[in-house]
Amino acid sequence: MLDKLNQPKGSTIGVLKDGRTIQEAFDSLGYLGVAVLSPANYGAKGDGKADDTIPLRQCVQDACALGGRVVGTVGAEYKISGTIAGTVGDGKYVELDFTGSKFVPTTDDAVMTITGVATSPVAEVTVEVVSVNLGNGSTNTIAMKVTAPGGHSFTKKGEIGKAWSPVLCLNNDLSTQYAGEPFVVGLVESSTVFYTTSVFTELYMGTSLKVIRVPTTQVVVKGLDVESEWTTGWKASTLTLSGLLRPFVYKPKCKNINGPFVNLTGCYGATVFLPEGDNLRNAPSEGAYGYFVNDSASFGSTIYGINCTNARHAYTTSSPRSEPTDDKWWLKGRTLFSEITNGLGTGCHNAFDTHSPSYGIKFTNCRAVGDFRGVDTGGAGFQIRGDRSSLVDCTAINSKIGAAFTAVNISGNSELYISGFTYEGPAGHLALSLSGKAGQINRVTISDSRWKTLEQYATAITNVEVSASNVEAVVDSATTASAAWRIGEGATLRTRGGAARFSAGSGHSVISLAASGAKVDVGDLEVTGSSFMQYLLATLSQYAGDVYIEADLDGALPGNPVGGGGTDLKAAVVYTAGNKFRRPLAYRALTIGNANGNTLGLNYSGHDVITWEITATVAGANVNGITPGAFIGQQLNIGSSPASTQQLIIKNGTNIAMGHAVTLEAGRGVTLYWNGANWRSGSV
């Protein structure tokens, strides 16, 4: 159609309302070397009554085919009954600017799809790891040598390609998700050989590996505003960009739509800037998924300034479905290295989400408010199911779960990094839920974070290794026996610094062990509100694994620092009143007023040196049992108080093997040491 409009210079064919000829308008509306097209010139009414599908489709298709800029009419309301689809080849610049206009779908069809079409051929290749000089220096680089016996289409360093194979992608959650990943050319050696420093995984090392050069199309979509009505059975996506290099979506907006809004499928370096959405219908039983931004098998997307209310996910990753042997390269692979910044999701089912196949997704300064348990979702502000994701300076308020990590579908080891995370929620809500997979190494690293909850437990951990530093947990629960950390099967908790604070209820603990075999190593922890506490560590099993706790309390505990632990439990080091020279577990003043045998406990003390001062008030007063030491070399000083009126006898017995009994007069003492099996005498 554009060719028909473009007449010879000076042509007077056709006159517009403003008196200009079509040719004059065509010549004057160039933009960066491309034509500027108006849907009105194609017959679009934009009056909210007429069906504008056909003229809009033709206008967009012309712009995509030849390279051009479409500018909608400010104030127009375009009713559409079918998809506006365009395909864009190499080297084209396409801009679709609908700022100030609105689209109203009248059928269950996608509003707009733009697909990049590679003009280069698909190449079947083999790969091998080699050392090659890719720069001007003398140091070689480990790279992938890619050989295409039938030839490839790459011509220079820096070009971007896509590789794929008929093997299922890593950590797939559907059996139709196949491996694929982009790469950057490092060196073109010949028409059949090139090199890349991108690391192809083992999924690409077998047969049937293919590559293609990603089209160099530039696509910009501005001001797309779509408003619909919730309709049972509707599920179509709104905007889908597929197979494009660095597409840019500027200020898209939606309201009351029935499926995903912005879909990035197999794109490289996409940007979505300031998207805004309200009320995305979520009905999984109908195939309707309220994804606001769906980042699908794309690489390095940047999503800035999400503002979304009432959706399944404000942001999510996914891996598209495809056939193992087709050449739809944009439908291959998983989402890699995307970053979501300054996002806000309110009243969503799970505001920010990643599916299992994703890798390296980063959320920075994102906020989730009021996420709830919706249809087929779990109510987490941040739901992380991929590997190597990170939450940086993020906040969840009143979400059912602040942040949830699960490795159920992860086929190998996985990690999550959390820094500067803040959570606040009512009773029944949980700050963190971390669930790993038995037999794998699932790690979560947390730093400089704070959460406050009225729930019985602030965190729940199962089959995950947690390393935390400077984490403050505030538990305001009135429920008896609450805890800042709940440690389950196969879990390890290591913390340094930070605090646990209690301000209501009674019988609380810093840590509650919910299963055998858990490991706890807590150092330099500040604990306030000890008047509301019963233990530092409450065990729900008789053997709790390896435990070491060092805490600074603001007052004494009513009993032992560890409750319900078996004799194999390790140790606790407790300080009180902010004064680390006062060690209640390291010193005990006792009285023995009977001639029976007495077994005394260390209260699980982990101090290097422990001192007991015992007052003996009856003849034959003796100690014939001591609970095990925390570690080899731990010392126990036992002294007979100057106030003793009788001798104090230390006998061989339970965990005591001195060779002979020791009798102590008033004011005398003995030093014992733990050798890993028994207490032995060191001096008298």
From Swiss-Prot:
Keyword flag ATP-binding: no
GO cellular component: virus tail
UniProt key word DNA repair: no
Intracellular or extracellular location(s): Virion
One GO-annotated biological process of the protein: symbiont entry into host cell via disruption of host cell envelope
Keywords for the protein's UniProt record, in alphabetical order: Degradation of host capsule during virus entry, Degradation of host cell envelope components during virus entry, Host-virus interaction, Viral attachment to host adhesion receptor, Viral attachment to host cell, Viral tail protein, Virion, Virus entry into host cell
Principal place of residence: virion
UniProt xrefs under InterPro entries: Pectin_lyas_fold, Pectin_lyase_fold/virulence
Main function: Functions as a receptor binding protein (RBP) and probably mediates the attachment to the host capsular exopolysaccharides. Displays a depolymerase activity that specifically degrades the K5-type polysaccharides of Klebsiella pneumoniae capsule, which allows the phage to reach the host cell membrane and bind the entry receptor.
Subunit record text: Homotrimer. Interacts (via N-terminus) with depolymerase 1 (via N-terminus); this interaction probably gives rise to a branched tailspike.
Family: In the N-terminal section; belongs to the Przondovirus depolymerase 2 family.
Stated name of the protein: Depolymerase 2, capsule K5-specific
Organism: Klebsiella phage K5-4 (Bacteriophage K5-4)
